[in-house]
Amino acid sequence: MQRIMKIAFFRREINPEIGALVAGYSMTDHSVMIEDDLFMTGLLCDDGENKILLISFDLQALDEWFIKQYRSSCGEILGIPASSVMFTCTHNHSGPQTICEPRYEHLLHRSYMDDLGKKILEETEKLTGKLQDADCFFYSSNVDENLNRRYVTPDNHASFLPSYNEMRPLCDGFADKELGCLFFMDPVKKLPLYIIGNYAAHPLAGHAPGLGGLKISADFPGAFRNYITAQTGAECMFVSGAAGDMIPKEDELGSDAARQMGIRLAKAALRSHIAATRNKDRYCMQNVKVGGLSKKFTVPLRKKYLDDQSNLPDFYQGSPDITLEIQCISIGDVCFVGLPGEPCAELGQEIKWHSPFRRTFIAFASTAYIDYVVPGNFLVSGGYEPRSHHFSARNSINFVKAAVDATYDLRESVYPSEGEPYPDYIDHPLVWKPGQQ
């Protein structure tokens, strides 16, 4: 029997007050104006048996305690496990202080967090009455809007590109260019209902020196959503990928840079939409099932954190190890992998390469905030990101392995194999042509 996907969604403004501390660059910058609104956007998918909820926030990050509390509460409202509720942040650097920074825990905007929690629960309560049928399409394309901010010399020494503008022409580090999209279509009217875009870049395009860093703004993810909605009528979500070392090509250049980058990504998403919907046999997923799963793993802290635990937020102090969570949710043959902190693109790409799903998208700052998560060799080459990598270098590969294991476990639970495990038994032709099964 054909399985009919149902979806419901919300969009809620989450601006702080003018004067609120602006997160991301310093602990002294206070906002002076709102340039464009911050939002949280949520999507509920129901396959008739299981549900998943994905919420994206125009925020820098959220603490683990907050994520766990409100994922659990949302799950109770919807009658689903907390592992089927995923939070992710765009990593916006033009919003309020929403995490407990080491030594600056007192600067957490607690009244804002209380209000945010109420808004999450209010919007989740409304979702079940909004469900409507939807066809689900997927599509990915490469879009050249980001670059790797690490310049690494032939003898493997890294420099932080934003501090050395003259090195930009030399920048050739790995960059994840994938713009991954999901399109939810009205099956009768054949019009788009909801669009998700996934791309890896710090939202820093609009953060110009001076006044540009004191404006409340969603940066390019907001411009992306606005353009999509204005042109299609569909609501829209942006999910940041593994953006730890990814920056916009026009980073820190102001409002126009943010707006134009968002529009260029949105145009690429519309091109993807056209291609996907005009080739339904290839890109429309059939009998879509959804699922969620989380996996925990424990790793030893680096000596710098063991010797001086004031480098850690209060709630991580007192232990030689740190326990982290990897979370996966799937919509058909597309998986979102929710990672803690700021994973670098190289790690995100490894997870994508090893996943058993047709397409895998990374969800940034999803399960906790633990600063940067880097490949082990970054601690050899240096640069900005490894300075705040929390755990032992040799465990970066275990981070990848835990995420990949989670993708396999989730796919097997949603689409159980018969006999030999998927995808081991697949025997593809040497050259695949559209229309082949």
Residue spans of the language-model regions?
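Conserved beta-alpha junction segments in alpha/beta enzyme cores
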Residues: 2-88, 95-235, 253-260, 273, ...
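Anionic-ligand-binding alpha/beta catalytic cores of soluble enzymes and soluble regulatory domains
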Residues: 265, 272
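Structured soluble/peripheral alpha/beta segments that form catalytic or ligand/cofactor-binding pockets
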Residues: 241-246
